[in-house]
């Protein structure tokens, strides 16, 4: 029984059932080549497709729409004007806009059109193959100047290294979720990152499977409001990708590896798959990228003289300053418990969500579930990692490791990241162990630790670089931010330091 939740009935997992019941209307401004395939695919999943090619028509339709898909596959200057008019109309009626930047990595004109559409600030979801997503990120990012990075291959693109990181960074840059498809699909909402197997390789040999995915994601996005209290946008879209990939694999079992037969079998599979299969296959995997842990702030009321208001102010300042992760650690004499702790955790969750900051709960697994935090961090003496994973599902799971001995007895298979420390002498934790120094990170990695690490304990702006150079992807800080005269400025210093590597 979760003491923070009054209604103990577990919500039913019914994404596909809900989609078919709601029958969302998806307006498709799409590639001439794939209209029929896209329409049939949307009908198969339980959505209602309608194709639109002029503003006069769209004005009548948009009031009924659950989502708008803009696919630039067959591009003309006249269509660009229509895309922009469609975006204005959709924004007026609060209809989510899904943009498929087909082939934008293959030509300057296509890329310029995509960038103009993104710069309207109205796109709700960007879905492209990994080469397309990388092209958009490279064009928008002032930090990515690597001219030797792998380019896409033709219009269909190729597998791109570091696609999880690119999806995360681009989602934060354009303030909307990004789906990057390849041999492994990645989705990020700017806070979380998820990986999903793409399906069968034959899907890339059938014209329209990528374009149909954009339409399917539009339909899913159109019903997200029904699930926003239980699933992050990223995790919800990851389930849509899992469904699509499962349909591809199921179709191959029926059709064999034959592109012509596959198309029919694929539409059938989209129609027949249900929520039970989607859950049982467990294809969604949480991914943690180094950027998420770069500046990791840990705090609770014990660090603010038991002043809740001050804690909330500091956390908001820290989020504005650029922390990438916040851990709510409420421990010690006089700290909050029960309903008061729950209410504060919810307030902190809202702040972190506002700034797309990863929100972690320290030790309290039940609280993490109750407030739908992004993750939980546990110590060596807390609940075993397998039990934690079984309870929190796809949430981020962090574990503290202080020594090589602890590493060898910890089942890191169930964790996503590790906190190593204390790096230096610390006054923030009265029960802290003896300092192990930054070299402990390298020692643990030499012994086989391959999870992302953050150093914690006594870290200041003066000694943080040594921790990062030792192999940590980030620094976890308490006092240097919580007790700073200007927390915002303190965070900026840590951010600049970490970014300089």
Question: Can you say where each PLM-predicted feature lies in the sequence?
Answer:
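Conserved N-terminal beta1-alpha1 strand-loop-helix module at the mouth
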Residues: 20-38, 43-49, 56, 289-375, ...
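Short glycine/threonine-rich catalytic loop with a Thr-x-Gly-x-Asp
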Residues: 200-217, 233-234, 259, 456-457
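Charged C-terminal helix
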Residues: 7-10, 245-289, 497
